[in-house]
């Protein structure tokens, strides 16, 4: 029987767990469309702890499987912790218009280190930021998941932008950060919007069709969130334009240094004195190391 915890099987399991985190997150955002608000006035107070626990278990299991399969080094996990903590600290930085430095850090980390790193960095950074700012509540798991999607999508984009000239890569990432400024706000609003008390054109009720639901939410978003998110989107773009090139270069230098070093050696051969024959040069044919190959972790999904 094949070992279910072999490196190949474990790496595959880790990727499946990343997909599972995304599926659980989507289900968590859509759940209130089928569940009514509770009597306490906190519509997500009941299911939020369950979603938090489930996502936490999936993240920890995925990281454990990565370490078990040796697809991630202990140093890369430590780097993930440091980047997540630094990004969480940036949440304390209040920018004009309500922007925050946490999102540009998550986006650049994902672009530099890859999809898996961006996903987990986004999740952990929002948790750290919430602990520092006192922002722990039923909204936290939804903020963390949305931030994780920012980092993961930046990792996918990073595989394409690294082929561009550095200047244009930064411009592309700045535009991407600008779009996510609106996307993040539109996604996170769903943690409470379906269970708002009201029957007006800005609210949702079970009798609405899908098209009517989209129309009502669009009106709600334009009325309550668009201006705030526009400021955040602008902050993302400006920060990336100003610091993106230097931060990406620093991240990628670290990624190269932390990448596993694999050296291949040629099989040892019998020396000339043991075989009774000599080589043309009179030297023994000792094993010599082949050219080392560097496995760059940033290319891993």
Predicted stretch roles:
Residues 268-297:
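Intrinsically disordered, low-complexity terminal tails and inter-domain linkers enriched
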Residues 88-103, 123-158:
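Interfacial aromatic-anchored transmembrane helix boundaries in multi-pass membrane proteins
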Residues 75-91, 174-182:
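Transmembrane alpha-helical segments of multi-pass membrane proteins
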Residues 44, 52-77, 81-85:
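Helix-loop-helix hairpins and the membrane-proximal interhelical loops
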Residues 2-53, 95-97, 101, 136, ...:
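Membrane-embedded alpha-helical hairpins and interfacial helices in multi-pass inner-membrane proteins
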Residues 72-82, 104-105, 142-146, 172-173:
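Cytoplasmic-side transmembrane-helix entry/capping segments in multi-pass membrane proteins
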């Amino acid at each position: 029987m094949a070992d279910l915890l072999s490196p190949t099987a474990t790496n595959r399991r880790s990727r499946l767990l990343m997909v599972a985190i995304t599926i659980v997150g989507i289900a968590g955002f859509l759940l209130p469309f089928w569940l009514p608000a509770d009597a306490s006035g906190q519509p997500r107070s009941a299911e939020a702890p369950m979603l938090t626990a489930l996502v936490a278990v999936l993240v920890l299991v995925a990281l454990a499987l990565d370490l078990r399969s040796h697809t991630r080094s202990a140093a890369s996990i430590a780097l993930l912790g440091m980047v997540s903590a630094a990004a969480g600290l940036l949440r304390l930085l209040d920018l004009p218009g309500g922007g925050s430095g946490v999102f540009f850090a998550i986006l650049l980390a994902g672009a530099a280190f890859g999809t898996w790193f961006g996903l987990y960095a986004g999740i952990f950074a929002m948790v750290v930021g919430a602990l520092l700012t006192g922002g722990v509540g039923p909204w936290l798991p939804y903020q963390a998941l949305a931030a994780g999607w920012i980092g993961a999508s930046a990792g996918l984009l990073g595989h394409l932008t690294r082929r561009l000239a550095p200047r244009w890569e930064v411009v592309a990432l700045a535009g991407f950060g600008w779009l996510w400024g609106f996307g993040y706000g539109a996604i996170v609003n769903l943690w409470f919007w379906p269970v708002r008390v009201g029957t007006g054109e800005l609210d949702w009720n079970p009798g609405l069709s899908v098209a009517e639901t989209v129309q009502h939410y669009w009106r709600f978003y334009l009325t309550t969130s668009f201006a705030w998110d526009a400021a955040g989107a602008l902050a993302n773009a400006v920060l990336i334009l100003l610091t993106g090139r230097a931060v990406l270069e620093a991240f990628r230098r670290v990624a190269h240094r932390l990448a596993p070093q694999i050296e291949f050696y040629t099989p040892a051969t019998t020396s000339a004195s043991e075989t009774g024959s000599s080589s043309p040069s009179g030297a023994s044919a000792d094993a010599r190391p082949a050219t080392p190959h560097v496995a760059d972790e940033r290319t891993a999904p």
